[in-house]
């Protein structure tokens, strides 16, 4: 679907299939700038600590403390309109840059919302967006996923005969997928790394995976666009969850306390 699509149509496809690929979410210049800046950050980023992170995979945590190149992506109007429909009140949970190196093994299939002990079935809790900065191919580690698995009954896990597809997508596009969709990074069988960014959003009443109020220094957070500040956690979940000494956290941030 193109980025000019109506948000209702994107949300309907996302909820029905568990995922949707939207083209034209970032222009070529934005992709080039983001790739170059993440290459800079990755120069001092270690590889993973375990098989899930990937022993030859680098992950840029605290993303919004280290680069400004995804500020606009995180607040893309179509993305926020879809999130308004699917999650209503939401926040950034786990934004991370991921570079899968040559020789990396396939990640186990998993659900991102399984970290929350909420009885099933439940409404959508997590929506991910995956932004490729290189071509994602079946050979270089493109994400694998099982279409429709977001709607599986409680307790069902992937079987050998479940149809696994590969997210072959190009830079400038973004794949939206529910946190209940079974998925995992693919094996990189090429001699070149593949780079992308995941922006994960979660319902506003859940604990964020990354504590952005500590990960992003206050002096950096003060300079961010207001909507991005809110998404990082400087916000209130209605009616008053998240206040600071009786005040809105964004007011405290602006005051320099």
Regions from the PLM with identified roles:
Residues 1-17, 22-118:
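Non-heme Fe(II)-dependent double-stranded beta-helix
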Residues 19, 126, 194-196:
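Short hydrophobic/aromatic beta-strand or adjacent loop that forms the aromatic wall/cage
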Residues 27, 71-72, 122, 165-168, ...:
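Aromatic-acidic/polar surface patches that form glycan- and anion
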Residues 65, 75, 146, 177, ...:
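A conserved hydrophobic position in a structured secondary element of the catalytic/binding core
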Residues 91, 123-125, 191-193:
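A short, structural micro-pattern
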Residues 94-97, 129-131, 197-201:
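A structural signal for short, well-ordered beta-strand segments
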Residues 104-169, 203-217:
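Catalytic core of non-heme Fe(II) oxygenases with the double-stranded beta-helix
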Residues 152-176, 180-181, 186-257:
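Conserved double-stranded beta-helix
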